[in-house]
Amino acid sequence: MGSLGSSQLKPFNKAPIDFVSTKRQPGAVCSLPELVDYNAQHNASHNFCIQGKPGGEFDTFTHADFKVAAANCAKWLKANLPLGASQAPNAITKNAPVALFMESDFGLVVHEFALLSLGIPPLVLSVRLPPNAIMHLLKSTGATSFIVSQKLSGPAKPALAALAANGIATAVGNPYTSFLEPGVDVASKGTFEVPENPDDITLLLHSSGTTGLPKPIPISHRMLMFAVSTAKFDTEDEAQGLNVSSLPLFHGFGLVAPGISMTVGKTTVYPASDGIPNIVSIIDLIKRTNARSLMTVPFLLDDVINNEEGLRVLAGLDFVGTGGAALGPGVGDKLAAAGIKLLNFYGTTESGPLSLVFVPKDNYNWKFFRLRTDMNFEIANLEPKDGVKRYRLTIRAFGEGEDQEIADQLIRNDEYPETDFAAVGRDDDVIVLATGEKASPQILENMLTEAPMVKAAIAFGENQFNLGVIVEPKEPLAEGGEAAFKELIWPIIVAAGQKMDAHSVIPSQEAVIVVPNGVRVPRTDKGSIARKEVYALFADAMKDVYEKLARAVGGADLKPLDLETLEEDIKALIIEHSGLKVPAEGLSAEESLFDFGLDSLQALKLRRVLAAAANKSEAMKDVNVDKVIPPEFVYLNPSVAQMAAAIKNPSAGSAAPTVDANAYKGVEKFAEQYALPGASAEEKAPSVRERAIVVVTGSSGSLGSHVVATLARDPKVMRVVVMVRQGSKPFDREPWTSRGINLKEDEFAKIVPLPVDPTAENLGVDPMMYGMLQNNLTHIVHAAWPMNYLTTLPSFQYQFEYLSGLLKLATSGNTANKRRFIFVSSIAAVARLSLSNSGAMISETPVEPVDAACGIGYADGKLVCEKILEKAAVSHAGQLEIAYVRCGQMTGSRATGAWNADEQIPMIFRTAKNLGVLPRIPGTLSWIPVDDAAQYIMDLSFFEGALPIASHLENPVRQSWADLMDGAGKFLGIQKSVSWPEWLELAGAAEDGPQDKYPVKKLFAFFKFSFGPMASGAVILGTDVARAHSATIKNMGALDASTIMKYFLHWQKINYL
């Protein structure tokens, strides 16, 4: 084996690599097994890698050692596994793959290259994949064998048994030491077999699976050779300096480090695999090996900004490269200011690394990646955004084959306009339904376009109650073949629906539009779908879809409603058409359908069936059924009895819906289902007040963004870890700048983005990063919550899973101190208490679900979370300090006037301006500026002493609505005013115009039945506890006229008013 301490520069003989030619050229190296052989012969004594070991020791391996280990491992594989040709139908590999489930170290590299040398494609699995994802990948690739490392074999025993039962051979891999033969002549191992076709698939990686199950990503010999040829150094000294890499080897970027070791001689140093690397251990590793560069994940670098020694060590390196996720701009700026030469890596698993690995010099800007020039690519112009030009990258790495268009939108560095770019967003669209729920169409579109009979699929449904999809057949259909084509693709659509949220499911084949023969789906010059143009082309067809869905529900056999037997008729419709699995005898007239699991899509379908049956009724022939049974009908009348009453007496629809007497059952059920399991007798020290590391959710919202800013400005806070959804747009300052929040560079540097999947195991966080959180976080502020007043309680289960996942994180890890957990609840959770008690003030205490639950999903969902937290505060009292904060009406910022235009109050004023009429809202209001609200969260997070389990965030000083409307009328130039009910009728009757002129209509049921009581003083929150724990609330007064004026000026500035 090689020597770690050798500092003498050895000449490295670079192989004549060819990834461009489709056919093998004489003397060229066209595959990784050939490259291993080349280096074993020409660079035998040059170090391939250095593997860290527990206790600070190292193993050093030359290229000759690597060849010997791979050859011996290949021999072991042939003796212990049933290797052979793929038997799977539609196989993408000639030979059946072998899965590798191993920790990221030299042992994984040895097994991977041993399989490559045998022509057996390794399927390299991430160690954080759950069992169902692993089984999916094994089946979809036709893998016949599964190798697990010794370290992981214990936890994997149940899974191994399941694999064996499915006919997959399993084996525990040997440690890499068993494959070494010190002193053996490398020539005795012969040479590996040379692949005939450079385009054969030789390696299988996989996607992250953030939008469903992970999919296998096939990599050919040429693609691999392209991937490892990404380095460009000016001197041998730059090329051969040791390179520490903590990038996981089972990800695409993990191949870069061993790749450049084989192509330019840059020896890789791997951390010990006995634990999760942290920045302290990485810095120590760099110092002990005299490494010259570092490749790592952004999260590790987030931890170095307050480590003076770490900054000094990293500043002495040739470069520090990051890939796989975005480095927070504030962190990057601070590292660059410390003299660290940051290098931005860019690429996709499918394309391979598209950026150069080099030593940054001169005025290279770390925020941009430097594009490789050894491939074919084109840069196309896109529509500018916010005055900044945007671009699209299309590559054809090898000069032939199909173009590969990268989904990211790019901006360019004007100093290096041909090569330096940054990714600023993706094309992935989210469709907002009429309920306010957000539907992500990617799973549906991807599964359809992957089908052999489909050329393109485009989902639609903006401001509708469900999605539809436009499908372009791959081949022209026979005359009259549309119905048969829909039948053919319908199982795919159903399968996609099983992986999507209930509200995203395609309801029937009526919602499928088949592109006619001769009609071309609009595309950009580079072949991507031009979504806006598609919607314009098929506007009439999409309109017909929703009209058909409304008309054709139930078919000709649907019986008309009979007012004499109305409850029985409605019950029969529910049993037959809703999709609920409930027997007729089990459905009482008084129980809420949502207690039986009715989801938003089923509610929509049931409303359509009821409307269709009502339209057939002789007794209702002169009635406007759409007004009697509006889109929100089932939400407002969730039981059979309530529906019957509302249909028999339509005038009662002007009154608020009655409270569902059984709503508390759903709250208690979910509170029990998602409670933090177990109990802990451990008693830790009180939570810390200094050097805090705070996890925050909901940072894209108004309160969340201000909480993050307030924390970042406080010297007690060392780091703010912002949880963002996986697949969301790149992290930048936009959530703060759009609200007028200015952060200094050192403040912004504290903010660290962390992509999560709220419903996945360990929140979908990489094990290394999750381990760091377990051992370092001190506080959690959970502010994420969807603003949707029509969603049912069962639809909030993913939020309960999110809370459960955060509580599990908060109670894990080895820390000496308790952790504080602050949850942002709502006035809605307890509003019923005041409404049913003549406006009595609500005290800051826990409430009973039987008294507070109201049947509105948004409100009852918050109540479920309160009950989950109350249980955790008792069962884990020695580990957690828990508080929830019920928030009243928050306004925009006191400092800047920035107030989100999509909130209730701005909606009222925009609608009023376009109507030319103001509403007269009775009573008083209690408004608290969002920056004051954020300061209260801060006060509570670091309060000296025991936390109150419940407190209220509301302005203790109330103001008159009449005074506010007088001022608003003068600003808007509106003199006319009518009562609140009359104004709502005007808004509801207004014709929809362009640009969302009457936004109140979007949430009409909420404004009609819920807004008034909570906004006008019928629901008043006590604030004694809050005032006792916060000077911010204690000293708060009424909002002055100048502050209120700032809000109107802000809405005017952004062209909302």
From Swiss-Prot:
Sequence positions that bind AMP: H251, N344, F345, T349, A423, V424, G425, R426
Superkingdom in the source lineage: Eukaryota
InterPro entries for the chain: ACP-like_sf, Adenylate-forming_Reductase, AMP-binding_CS, AMP-dep_synth/lig_dom, ANL_N_sf, Far_NAD-bd, NAD(P)-bd_dom_sf, PP-bd_ACP
Pathway entry: Secondary metabolite biosynthesis; terpenoid biosynthesis
Documented EC number(s): 1.2.1.-
Keywords: ATP-binding, NADP, Nucleotide-binding, Oxidoreductase, Phosphopantetheine, Phosphoprotein
Keyword Plastid in annotation: no
Reactions accelerated catalytically: ilicicolinate B + AH2 + ATP = ilicicolin B + A + AMP + diphosphate
Class of the enzyme per the UniProt entry, highest EC level: oxidoreductase
UniProt-annotated stretches for the region Adenylation (A) domain: 21-378
GO terms classed as biological process: terpenoid biosynthetic process
Gene Ontology molecular function: ATP binding; oxidoreductase activity
Binding site for NADP(+): S700, G701, S702, L703, A783, A784, W785, Y858, K862
Keyword ATP-binding listed: yes
Reductase (R) domain as annotated region, ranges: 693-1025
Modified residues (O-(pantetheine 4'-phosphoryl)serine): S600
Domain Carrier: 564-651
Family, similarity comment: Belongs to the adenylate-forming reductase family.
Function: Nonribosomal peptide synthase-like protein; part of the cluster that mediates the biosynthesis of LL-Z1272-beta, also known as ilicicolin B, a prenylated aryl-aldehyde produced by several fungi and that serves as a key pathway intermediate for many fungal meroterpenoids. The first step in the pathway is performed by the non-reducing polyketide synthase stbA that produces orsellinic acid by condensing acetyl-CoA with 3 malonyl-CoA units. The prenyltransferase stbC then prenylates orsenilic acid into grifolic acid. Finally, grifolic acid is reduced to ilicicolin B by the NRPS-like protein stbB.
PANTHER family: ENZYME, PUTATIVE (JCVI)-RELATED, PHENYLACETATE-COENZYME A LIGASE
Record remark on domains: Contains three distinct domains: an adenylation (A) domain that activates the substrate amino acid which is subsequently covalently linked as a thioester (aminoacyl-S-PCP) to the 4'-phosphopantetheine prosthetic group of the second domain, the peptidyl carrier protein (PCP) domain, as well as a reductase (R) release domain.
Name of the protein in its database record: Adenylate-forming reductase stbB
Organism lineage string: Eukaryota, Fungi, Dikarya, Ascomycota, Pezizomycotina
Gene name tied to this protein: stbB
